[in-house]
């Protein structure tokens, strides 16, 4: 019973940690990703006309539509250079207050193509040695002119160049902070050379809107030439990987639980040998082989299920304590969270209980049949 309880407790804790990590990732995505994202079904760029945009805005639940133009480019400043990911946005991005809470220094504005300012990830800001006090020498941004590259070799005529000053520093998460520069949309169009084209249209919903319902309405409006993704679908591979890892952990722990159930197997086997005389007395009293078999199977289930209940109770208490007090630290400097995240799901307890019942039932079959054979001398 003790071994089963320990395995069940460990399984509940591990599954709760995976749930917590998934919940944390989703919360992190909510910080910088839109509720819905409109992409072209087969092209790198997408463009919606004024009629389409007006029709989308009329859908209940849609608060903002943010056109964005994204691509990688090179920035240079003070003999330093870095490949970053530019994200061009218009005034609707600022109107939606996106990433405003993540500003740790500076002012939340972008300017325009004539005098461009940018919201810069803190990693980019520090690695490039940027400063708000510098108002003379802007940061240079370079991007290859693909049309010229097809006809000429790489030289200064095949590179587009723009300049900007930092207006604010953003701190979101490491990968975002180390590569993101948010710039005015018109500035980004000039750098990339694709006026009117967008990487995506990002939709922010009102608080009471259902993302799946709005998604279906947008898809119905735009047709098959466009793809509409929810926030989870934008990170489908990562979330799927977490679920697969959780499944494999469950299977591995179930296998370990199966090994631990050998203690139940031997305990019941010894009980059969020890109670041989008592079993024959039961036979003399008229017990049938089927009744005896059920008795030992039921005994095995009681022992294992008692251990499972104790294990689930201990797992619940320890998970609750970690959730409330952060007992086990994450151990990563400058992490967004200090302790391992925990999120308990009722289905984890249910499937753990099912796994315990199935495994222990199988482990009880041989001792139960052995008891019947020894008592009734069945070969």
Predicted regions and their residues:
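N-terminal Sec/SRP start-transfer signal
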Residues: 1-11, 22, 27, 290, ...
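Basic-flanked hydrophobic alpha-helices used for secretion and membrane insertion
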Residues: 120, 133-225
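Short helix-loop junctions at transmembrane helix boundaries
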Residues: 294, 309-354, 365-374
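Hydrophobic, regular-secondary-structure patches
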Residues: 11, 15-85, 91-114, 220
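Short acidic/glycine-enriched loop/turn elements at secondary-structure junctions
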Residues: 63, 72-165, 190-192
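Hydrophobic alpha-helical transmembrane segments of multi-pass inner-membrane transport and secretion
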Residues: 1-19, 243-278, 301-310, 358-362
